[in-house]
Amino acid sequence: MPVRQLPETVVNRIAAGEVVERPASVVKELVENAIDAGASRIDIFTDGGGRRRIGITDDGAGMTHADLTLAVDRHATSKLDDEDLLAIRTLGFRGEALPSIGSVAKLSITTRHAAEPHAWALAVEGGAKSPIVPAALSHGTRVEVSDLFYATPARLKFLKTDRTEAEAIREVVRRLAMARPDIAFSMAGEERAPVTWAAALPGAAGRLTRLGDILGGDFRSNAIEVRSERDGVVVEGFAAAPSLTRANALGQYLFVNGRPVRDKLIIGAVRAAYSDYLPRDRHPVVALFVSLDSREVDANVHPAKTEVRFRDAGLVRALIVHALKEGLAREGKRTAANDAGATISSFRPSFAPRANWDWRSSPSYPVAGSAAFDAAAGFAEREQSGFDVGAPSADVRSYQPSADFTDRPLGAARTQIHQTYIVAQTRDGLVVVDQHAAHERLVYEKLKASLATNGVQRQILLIPEIVELDEATVERLVARGEELATFGLVVESFGPGAVAVRETPSLLGKTDAGALLRDLAEHMAEWDEALPLERRLLHVAATMACHGSVRAGRVLKPEEMNALLREMEDTPNSGQCNHGRPTYVELKLSDIEKLFGRR
């Protein structure tokens, strides 16, 4: 068959295969056109997952008769001139969307420009244009697409169910709405209640309002503002506190010069920034906005324009990591704002009848006048068994028995319940602390600080502890011996299937070396060899901190509890343990009063 020029309709359908993959692609292209037209409100309607009908209405600048004539021709655009390909400032620029859509569907465009006496309408079916005719429209543009892919029936077989396609459309609109909080959006159709997002005020507060409307109240309550800037590149936005996580990275959004993009860059950068706060199987929710000179980023990577290429990707990644780490450190003592309130709201007073029971006869009830009954005695009259000598605990040297700690952020310790939780009284409520989670964070931060200064202090074991392990585990530990020694853990091979532990970190006190080594070996087996040394060392520190912390079930003396609270107040990131769980929750007196009907 000789080489020949393909007909224009066939060329457009081939191009449509890249630009119009599914109904969500159509919505994306049309909404981006509305944004580029300066719209302040965009209304979206879909039916049948976008297959049967898609309608986009905006109040933007509209098109003149001449512009409308060219708008459905390939590579005809008002957004680009001969020199601008490396300095793209609009969402669309290729001039392919409308002709591609018109080649595979029934397309109708009604538009009015301020310079025109009335609106104009144009219809395209399967690539064939109808004459432009006068129409009725006050201003802006209305685009309707029906019978998508009717001209290419084979494409219909690759679409998902209406529900799946509708959800893909909603996700596209959500991302565009997050990128432009200054524009009002509405979505209707698909037998769902209409969704409307009002235009938000300029600035960070308005952006957070829009993000909260889309990502939910939990995100709004736990959002941390972040920002970092260098060499003309600005990274800003909001990141959720470590206590708000998801099982996947779908809650991580990146916007570059107002364009929603999907980039593996953000996943790696966010994981690095949150490495001190979250377990490996949890992912935070973040929305980051990158602003830079348009000549420093290439948006012409793919026809769908969902990918970009940075001239200096390393700088962008470093700024993302710095912005997130700085924000997390600044809010390090913050707990999940919604946790305590949600729990309190679920409490209900119980009026169920009780069996006859004489509480005065209970052997645990102290009789008035006895030594155990002393309302004023408090902790001072109680005897509690403390830690074993040498066991790690909070530093009690700064504890002041006579001091009133209720004015401190974490208050004054009042009791310990279930030998696991410390209850402290603050000026306007109470705080409940998970003693293991809190101490784990303290030990971890001390290990990191020691590593950054003079190294971790070691304690030599008089008798080396021999730990029996399988040979693969022994090889793994010995191979990482230098990294372990950095943290004061010195191990040597001790014949087949065993290692000798000769030194341990002083900070851990008396620890179960066997359990620690098995845990470390398990984590090492999951490490990628490409994992940076710093990340590997942090994993080691986190594992050691977990093993070297106060365990649940240990009775604490009042001075130890108060010392732990004071250390938490002076330690960065003490609001979460190394696994992302909150170390404490705070209940305001007003919440407690509501629980008992006093408010």
Curated annotation (Swiss-Prot):
UniProt signal peptide: none
Presence of keyword DNA repair: yes
Domain of life: Bacteria
GO MF term list: ATP binding; ATP hydrolysis activity; ATP-dependent DNA damage sensor activity; mismatched DNA binding
Keyword Ribosomal protein: no
GO biological process, one term: mismatch repair
Assigned GO CC terms: mismatch repair complex
Keywords: DNA damage, DNA repair
InterPro entries associated with the record: DNA_mismatch_repair_CS, DNA_mismatch_repair_MutL, DNA_mismatch_S5_2-like, HATPase_C_sf, MutL/Mlh/PMS, MutL/Mlh/Pms-like, MutL_C, MutL_C_dimsub
Cited NCBIfam families: mutl (TIGR00585), PRK00095.2-4 (NF000953)
Family: Belongs to the DNA mismatch repair MutL/HexB family.
Function noted in UniProt: This protein is involved in the repair of mismatches in DNA. It is required for dam-dependent methyl-directed DNA mismatch repair. May act as a 'molecular matchmaker', a protein that promotes the formation of a stable complex between two or more DNA-binding proteins in an ATP-dependent manner without itself being part of a final effector complex.
PANTHER family according to UniProt: DNA MISMATCH REPAIR PROTEIN MLH, PMS, MUTL, DNA MISMATCH REPAIR PROTEIN MLH1
Protein name: DNA mismatch repair protein MutL
Biological source species: Rhodopseudomonas palustris (strain BisB18)
Gene of this entry: mutL
